[in-house]
Amino acid sequence: MLEKYKLKNGATVLLDHVDGVRSASIGLWFRAGSRDETPQEAGAAHFIEHMLFKGTASLSSAELAGRMDDIGAEANAFTSRDCTNYYMRVLDKRMPEAAELLADMLFNSRFDEGDMSTERGVIL
């Protein structure tokens, strides 16, 4: 059964438990997609999506990828017209670590000039 909670900060949390399933997914959805961008900002949401995988204040991109591998995470993100989503799928016992990594990516990402230059060529 789907459970829905509203946090004090306005975020909505949805939980769905499926008996007998040992995998768990965490996804963070943001109402920020291409339709929210002006012509001068075109590609910004997609650019930021890529940059969040380029490392954090405490983890290089290689270390971040290594930590994801260590916990067996399938991690990805996408940007659509309406939203941007970051997600990981792991074994249920690894969910705390997956949530910690996603939080680190969202709150502590490094926007390294070299990485930004590379991603500008890919995205913009």
Locate predicted features.
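Charge-rich, well-structured scaffold segments of protease-associated domains
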Residues: 6, 17, 61-124
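N- or domain-start disorder-to-order transition segments that initiate the globular core
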Residues: 1-23
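M16/MPP (pitrilysin/insulinase) zinc-metallopeptidase core fold and M16-derived inactive scaffolds
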Residues: 20, 25-89
